[in-house]
């Protein structure tokens, strides 16, 4: 039995997927919520938000993500970073998953990955959970209803959390699996209910396919000046560095908060929604994002709530610190209707430096920008219990290593070419610690970060006096209107300057050690600006 709206020549049966129970094609939000409630997948929250728990997995499983190694991709995938799967293992996995699906109810969503029609990917997402259908409707871009009648997918994703993989039979690592097959244009996800796997699978596809067209895929947020899409800025950064927070600027138009492409026409969002962290979210600091948590259809993932009043607890991280909400872009009042922008005038690379040695903002040359893009430095903080003062540095190349199927230099060279052609100004912004490392210093004041970004984006920072940083070689402004000058010189914010020097030297050595892996692949101008 099938219901909903679908291209009559592109049903699941036409794809060779037979024998399922009820199949629901392209249901809209109210119908998906009704189905999810009927199946007891979650709770209806305030304002019609949908509250879910994802069980064992409350985050992505990068070690369980595999790419099928076939002759067509064997030489282009970065195998150091992507686990391989044999074609035989994938074929067995697909056959067993289809057998497992027989007689069960499924939800199908036909969607677009990419706001630019010239470069979008048409994706069919088949989900066992109704709320996963709701989630992916928010995260990807929705066709007009009439467009569904002729929709044919470039790629299909099947997500079946109740299916458990067999590592011996399916050539994978555990009973959880995310398997990408570029030849069969198919992604299989099993053994995890965490919804983020759906969105990041599409991101990984675009990250592989777009460079062949000369398009730079970016793990970044983006915004543009009001009434002037040509004045676009992109914000690269790993999770927790401030991509979502800093791009949500009431003075600028939001293009998107996480995944974008840079084509010959400019910037475009891959997505149609946002997937924001909600831990410690407040109406004062982030009113727009906070408001979405009580809007119709917003998916609230892994948040503790009062069973009687349905009030959400933004502080309780007992389920996970990675609690999130997913909502369509149009829930943010200053979001772009087209999700398109110009060529970036400013490129911001966000880092959370828990060593407390990087300045709050630095200007980068194009070669330095390539260096920092390939390095992808930030810090994870070990924990909030007392006595844990040792930050955990991490280098995630391209500010998004888990989603990069190709070698990092492919993306780095694309970025370098685009900066050279369009003349973007590049900045490194530290949203981490100042006045000492994590444990002794304090978090960089967000007001100061916003003031520095405003000066960078409106062009006034270009007129400032800059000094060259002795440790890292980039240019640092000496004074910026509205920002405490002492903040701009990290060494001066430390009580013990010898301790600062030792900590800075430690970070310099880490940069040098990490970057050694890229030296054989890069140009002389980038080698010349390498730290250490």
Swiss-Prot record:
Recorded GO CC terms: cytosol
Q: Which cofactor does it need?
A: Mn(2+)
Which reaction equations make up its catalytic activity? oxaloacetate + ATP = phosphoenolpyruvate + ADP + CO2
A Pfam family that this protein carries is PEPCK_ATP
Lineage: superkingdom: Bacteria
Q: Where does substrate bind?
A: 60, 194, 200, 324
Q: What class of enzyme is it?
A: lyase
Annotated keywords: ATP-binding, Cytoplasm, Decarboxylase, Gluconeogenesis, Lyase, Manganese, Metal-binding, Nucleotide-binding
Q: What is its main location?
A: cytoplasm
Task: Summarize where Mn(2+) binds, as residue positions.
Answer: 200, 219, 258
Q: Which InterPro entries does the record cross-reference, listed alphabetically?
A: PEP_carboxykinase_ATP, PEP_carboxykinase_C, PEP_carboxykinase_N
Q: What does this protein do?
A: Involved in the gluconeogenesis. Catalyzes the conversion of oxaloacetate (OAA) to phosphoenolpyruvate (PEP) through direct phosphoryl transfer between the nucleoside triphosphate and OAA.
User: What name has this protein been given in UniProt?
Assistant: Phosphoenolpyruvate carboxykinase (ATP)
């Amino acid at each position: 039995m099938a219901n909903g709206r679908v291209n009559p020549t592109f049903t699941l049966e036409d794809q060779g997927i037979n024998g399922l129970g009820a199949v629901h094609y392209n249901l809209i939000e109210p119908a998906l919520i009704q189905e999810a409630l009927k199946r007891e997948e979650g709770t209806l929250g305030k304002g019609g938000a949908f509250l879910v728990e994802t069980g064992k997995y409350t985050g992505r499983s990068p070690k369980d993500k595999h790419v099928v190694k076939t002759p067509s991709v064997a030489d282009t995938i970065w195998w150091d970073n992507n686990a391989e799967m044999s074609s035989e293992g994938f074929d067995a996995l697909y056959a067993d998953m289809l057998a497992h699906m027989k007689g069960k109810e499924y939800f199908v969503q036909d969607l677009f990955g990419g706001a630019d029609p010239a470069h979008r990917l048409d994706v069919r997402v088949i989900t066992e959970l109704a709320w996963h259908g709701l989630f992916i409707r928010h995260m990807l871009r929705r066709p007009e209803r009439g467009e569904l009648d002729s929709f044919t997918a470039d790629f299909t994703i099947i997500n079946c959390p109740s299916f458990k993989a067999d590592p011996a039979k399916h050539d994978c690592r555990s009973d959880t699996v995310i398997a990408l097959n570029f030849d069969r244009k198919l992604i299989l996800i099993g053994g995890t209910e965490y919804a983020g796997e759906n969105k990041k699978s599409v991101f990984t596809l675009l990250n592989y396919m777009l460079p062949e067209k000369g398009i730079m895929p970016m793990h970044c947020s983006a915004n543009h000046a009001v009434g002037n899409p040509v004045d676009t800025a992109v914000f690269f950064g790993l999770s927790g560095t401030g991509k979502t927070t800093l791009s949500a600027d009431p003075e600028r138009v939001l293009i998107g908060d996480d995944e974008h492409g840079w084509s010959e026409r400019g910037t475009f969002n891959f997505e149609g929604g946002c997937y924001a962290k909600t831990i410690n979210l407040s109406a004062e600091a982030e009113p727009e994002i906070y408001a979405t948590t009580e809007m119709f259809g917003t998916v609230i993932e892994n948040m503790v709530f009062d069973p009687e009043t349905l009030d959400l607890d933004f502080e309780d991280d007992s389920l996970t610190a990675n609690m999130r909400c997913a909502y369509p872009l149009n829930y943010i009042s200053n979001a772009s209707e087209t999700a398109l922008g110009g060529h970036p005038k400013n490129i911001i690379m966000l880092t959370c430096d828990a060593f407390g040695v990087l300045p709050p903002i630095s200007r980068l040359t194009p070669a330095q920008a390539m260096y920092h893009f390939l390095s992808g430095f930030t810090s994870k903080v070990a924990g909030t219990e007392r006595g844990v003062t040792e930050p955990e540095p991490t280098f995630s190349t391209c500010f998004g290593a888990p989603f990069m199927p190709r070698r990092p230099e492919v993306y780095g060279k694309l970025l370098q070419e685009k900066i050279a052609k369009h003349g973007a100004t590049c900045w490194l912004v530290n949203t981490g610690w100042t006045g000492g490392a994590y444990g002794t210093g304090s978090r960089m004041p967000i007001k100061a970060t916003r003031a520095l970004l405003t000066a960078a984006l409106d062009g006034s920072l270009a007129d400032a006096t800059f000094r060259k940083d002795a440790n890292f070689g980039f240019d640092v402004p000496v004074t910026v209107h509205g920002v405490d000058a002492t903040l701009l010189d990290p060494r001066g914010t430390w009580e013990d300057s010898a301790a600062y020097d030792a900590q800075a030297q430690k970070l310099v050595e880490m940069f040098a050690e990490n970057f050694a892996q890229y030296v054989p692949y890069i140009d002389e101008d980038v080698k010349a600006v390498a730290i250490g």
